[in-house]
């Protein structure tokens, strides 16, 4: 069951889009959605987020539909997660944990696996009492990947492991920065909202075959390809993990070495899906995340991808009006790619 509590004056359309995104996260995590439940409240209940009546409705709905998991769009603190687990007698988790689950499944390189393990352990450190309660209920998806073997650890050993992982990632980041300092070509980094088509754009510009999947967070590891802009100019184009609303701060911190490529780039291509009805929200999320990782000052171009889709006819027009320098493209059909190459070349001359 998917659950969302809408508090205060939160925009209804934005909340609906967030819930739809949560459903896609569930699908990516391999969870079948049995139904949805929403509640609007002036403020969240400190103990269970939901009101008592709605909590009873949720338990009944889970029983009627055979739902073994309850996924909240809202971030749950440890107390709320513990109380909800006891009240519902089911596996309860939130958007943050769902994203961690997806990252654990998608991590391939040693660096990505180390970053996922760090994020998992920092999350588990705050949830040990909740996990003990949840272990009494069967059918949970649980934490998978490197963090799983640490469920029984307690604070001191876990903190030592976290410190070790941070040190390891700091060494990776330092090594990567030294390597980038020797690069023979300018580096342009593809950043943007998850599932905006960054990997497809990388393939289209570089004539490459990077992995592409119509699911959230298909890319965790940084991929770099050589791209020819014309007139003898070449760049290194990188593609890295996508952004999403409410991306956990701990996850951003854990993936610092991967996201550092954006901070060190000569130019950023901020890619969003022009066919999405709330494309401006995605632009705002991207800008905020870039600020958070320290890349807000890097020169950038806004790229409106998927402009060939029928749904983009109106949304892309509005986005272009708000961002007159944005470049509409279609990585799938090739529309606008020559214009994008020229824009990149001109920007790098400055």
Protein language model features and the residues they cover:
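Conserved G1/Walker A P-loop phosphate-binding module
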Residues: 131, 135-252, 259-263, 267
């Amino acid at each position: 069951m998917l659950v969302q509590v809408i508090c205060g004056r939160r925009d209804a359309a934005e909340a609906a889009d967030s819930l739809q995104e949560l459903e896609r996260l569930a699908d990516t995590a391999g969870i079948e959605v049995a139904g949805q439940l929403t509640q609007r409240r002036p403020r969240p209940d400190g103990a269970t987020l939901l009101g008592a009546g709605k909590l009873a409705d949720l338990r009944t709905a889970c029983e009627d539909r055979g739902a073994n998991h309850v996924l909240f769009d809202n971030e749950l603190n440890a107390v709320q997660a513990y109380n909800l687990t006891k009240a519902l007698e089911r596996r309860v988790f939130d958007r943050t944990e769902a994203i961690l689950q997806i990252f654990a499944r998608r991590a391939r390189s040693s660096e990505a696996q180390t970053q996922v393990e760090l994020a998992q352990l920092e999350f588990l450190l705050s949830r040990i009492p909740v996990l003990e309660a949840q272990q009494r209920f069967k059918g949970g998806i649980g934490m998978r990947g490197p963090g799983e073997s640490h469920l029984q650890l307690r604070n001191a050993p876990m903190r030592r492991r976290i410190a070790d992982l941070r040190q390891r990632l700091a060494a990776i980041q330092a090594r990567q920065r030294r390597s980038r300092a020797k690069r023979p070509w300018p580096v342009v980094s593809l950043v943007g909202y998850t599932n905006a088509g960054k990997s497809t754009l990388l393939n289209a510009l570089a004539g490459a075959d990077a992995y592409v999947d119509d699911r959230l967070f298909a890319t965790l590891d940084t991929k770099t390809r050589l791209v020819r802009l014309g007139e003898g100019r070449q760049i290194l184009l990188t593609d890295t993990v996508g952004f999403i609303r409410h991306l956990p701060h701990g996850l951003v911190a854990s993936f610092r070495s991967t996201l550092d490529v954006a901070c060190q780039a000569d130019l950023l291509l901020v890619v969003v899906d022009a066919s999405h009805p709330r494309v401006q929200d995605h632009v705002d999320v991207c800008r905020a995340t870039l600020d958070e990782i320290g890349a807000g000052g890097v020169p950038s171009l806004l790229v409106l991808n998927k402009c060939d889709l029928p749904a983009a006819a109106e949304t892309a027009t509005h986005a272009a009006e708000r961002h007159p320098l944005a470049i509409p493209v279609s990585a799938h059909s090739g529309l606008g790619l020559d214009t994008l190459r020229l824009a990149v070349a001109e920007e790098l001359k400055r």
